[in-house]
Curated annotation (Swiss-Prot):
The keyword NADP does not apply. It comes from the Eukaryota. WD repeats lie at residues 9-48, 54-95, 101-142, 148-201, 208-251, 257-296. The keyword Repeat applies. GO terms for molecular function: structural molecule activity. GO terms for cellular component: endoplasmic reticulum; Golgi apparatus. It comes from Arabidopsis thaliana (Mouse-ear cress). It is found in: Golgi apparatus; Endoplasmic reticulum. Belongs to the WD repeat SEC13 family. This is Protein transport protein SEC13 homolog A. Required for protein transport from the endoplasmic reticulum to the Golgi apparatus. The lineage of its organism: Eukaryota, Viridiplantae, Streptophyta, Embryophyta, Tracheophyta. Interacts with MAG5, SEC31A and SEC31B. The gene is SEC13A. Keywords: Endoplasmic reticulum, ER-Golgi transport, Golgi apparatus, Protein transport, Repeat, Transport, WD repeat. Disulfide bonds: none annotated.
Length: 302
């Protein structure tokens, strides 16, 4: 698909842009307190489909659920609300559920791999992470990581449901149930859910950054022999964290010092390309070479 400009119609800063599973629709979150859904096509055209209103503050992030759960979108905001939006008739969206467990800004949300069921992780400025999991009766169970990052959680990202090295995600008896998080304490942490509660799964915390961690992204690992997490920070650095087997230590390598805050890091579906957006309005794409060094493969022109 060639690069194309999308007119969203937002009246203030856009904080998040997420494409749906099929690549047909884009959801955007803005400081104008709204979410907009825009249809996109390979021919380069775009069409406004819906505006979702209900937040009372800037909307920081949006996240599409896997289509096996229907047409479902989550959003989080400075107002402390996490709203689940469900599409009934085409482009007719309603609020299916509103979570108000956090009384402060909710900064990041992420749906779990679909193999784990319908579960949403949320990180907030109160330092806590909440995970909401849908029950068969339509209700929701909540598990919490209290004071995950005491000064505030900035980002959450789920591990793939498959163990590193697996070539297929078929009939897993014991799927991986882990989260990575970043915070204002400059650390990245890994959490594992077992026996009904979340426990830290990295000792000590991953602490090569010297300022707020702005984003963490756990890489897809199908067929890859290791687990990989990318983190981007206010300190300008992107760090690639890797671990081989369970029980080993995470190792961090600086991909690059961008000399300006790094806002977002995002993996390709195959886990071999990493996109980085920085404070100079640049988006660069990186790939690991055979010798383990990271090299820039392209710049996405604005």
């Amino acid at each position: 698909m060639p690069p194309q400009k999308i007119e969203t119609g937002h009246s203030d800063t856009i904080h998040d842009v997420v494409m749906d599973y099929y690549g047909k629709r884009v959801a955007t979150a803005s400081s104008d307190c709204t979410i907009k859904i825009t249809g996109v096509s390979n021919s380069g055209g775009s069409q406004h489909l819906a505006t979702l209103t209900g937040h009372r503050g800037p909307v920081w992030q949006v996240a599409w659920a896997h289509p096996k759960f229907g047409s479902l979108l989550a959003s989080c905001s400075y107002d402390g609300q996490i709203i689940l939006w469900k599409e009934g008739n085409q482009n007719q969206w309603t609020q299916a559920h509103v979570f108000t467990d956090h009384k402060v800004s909710v900064n990041s949300i992420a749906w779990a791999p679909h193999e784990l069921g319908l579960s949403l992780a949320c990180g907030a400025s109160d330092g806590n992470i909440s995970v909401f999991s849908a029950r068969a009766d339509g209700g929701w169970d909540t598990t919490k990581i209290d004071q995950a990052h005491p000064v505030g959680v900035t980002s959450v990202s789920w591990a793939p449901a498959t163990e590193p090295g697996a070539l297929v995600s078929s009939g897993m008896i014991d799927p991986v149930y882990k989260l990575a998080s970043g915070g204002c304490d400059s650390t990245v942490k890994v959490w594992k859910f077992s026996n009904g509660s979340w426990k830290m799964d990295c000792f000590p915390a991953l602490n090569k950054h010297t300022d707020w961690v702005r984003d963490v992204a756990w890489a897809p690992n199908l067929g890859l022999p290791k687990s990989t997490i990318a983190s981007g920070s206010e300190d300008g650095k992107v760090i690639i964290w890797t671990i081989g087997k369970e029980g080993e230590q995470w190792e961090g390598t600086v991909l690059k010092d961008f000399k300006t805050p790094v806002w977002r890091v995002s993996w390709s579906l195959t886990g071999n390309l990493l996109a980085v957006s920085d404070g100079n309005n640049n988006v660069t794409v990186w790939k690991e070479s055979v010798d383990g060094e990271w090299e820039q493969v392209t710049v996405v022109e604005p």
